[in-house]
């Protein structure tokens, strides 16, 4: 139990608790997407950065309802692709409120299409113009 509590504290302290969220617009169905460029960390061609999905209406995951999700993303700057590392589901908007659930299963790399919000996030993470 102490290990779970410690890992949760570490994730939250490494995450965007007092983030400087930059809006990237709406992504259909009332979801606003934000990123915090101050959380970027680079390792070669790969960059990690926190992204926030803020919902106008409650979303369901299993039996919990949440209004925002903070995602720790990894971007490949050599190729336009990304993968999710961790997602934290939060009860309130803009990442505020109680943490309801957390998932950190390794995901697969997903290609990024030009002209999408994902492409804009990739450009921010990788310092592309």
How should each PLM-predicted stretch be described?
Residues 4-13:
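Sec-dependent N-terminal signal peptides
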Residues 16-129:
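N-terminal secretory-pathway/extracellular module detecting exported/lumenal segments
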């Amino acid at each position: 139990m102490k290990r779970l509590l410690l890992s949760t504290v570490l994730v939250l302290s490494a995450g965007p608790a007092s983030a400087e969220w930059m809006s990237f617009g709406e992504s259909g169905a009332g979801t606003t997407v934000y990123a915090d460029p101050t959380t970027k960390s680079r390792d070669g061609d790969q960059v990690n950065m926190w992204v926030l999905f803020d919902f106008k209406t409650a979303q369901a995951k299993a039996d919990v309802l949440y209004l925002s999700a903070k995602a720790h993303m990894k971007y490949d700057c050599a190729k336009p692709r990304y993968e999710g590392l961790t997602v934290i589901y939060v009860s309130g908007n803009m990442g505020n409120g109680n943490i309801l659930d957390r998932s950190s299963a390794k995901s697969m790399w997903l290609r990024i299409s030009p002209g999408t919000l994902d492409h804009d996030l990739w450009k921010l993470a990788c310092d592309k113009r």
